[in-house]
């Protein structure tokens, strides 16, 4: 059952609930955290969360942060660019950035090597500007 339109796309109830929970979160969330938050809305099993997350990734509405095993809402309409996530290891803040030159370099490298990427995400761990000054 489709219920919500997001960026011109119709989302199912579960997709809309997961997207809403991620949008309201102050940092990326894991699947089990999402499940706990959404139990009152009818989520009973991790598979429901994972299916919704997979579909939201396919719709380019969320990103999976591999190193954190967590998901976050896509902050921009840069679907051709490679997102770069700056992850603060002290406070847990995550910011999404885009760089056309970096994306072009990744595309060029892939083409030269005959590699066809499904997706590319870059994660940089360190300290954010607030924590580095502490």
Q: Can you say where each PLM-predicted feature lies in the sequence?
A:
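Non-DNA-binding regulatory cores of transcription-related proteins
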Residues: 59, 63-68, 72-134
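Basic amphipathic alpha-helical segments that dock to polyanions
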Residues: 49-59
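Short helix-capping/hinge SLiMs at alpha-helix to coil transitions
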Residues: 9, 23-28
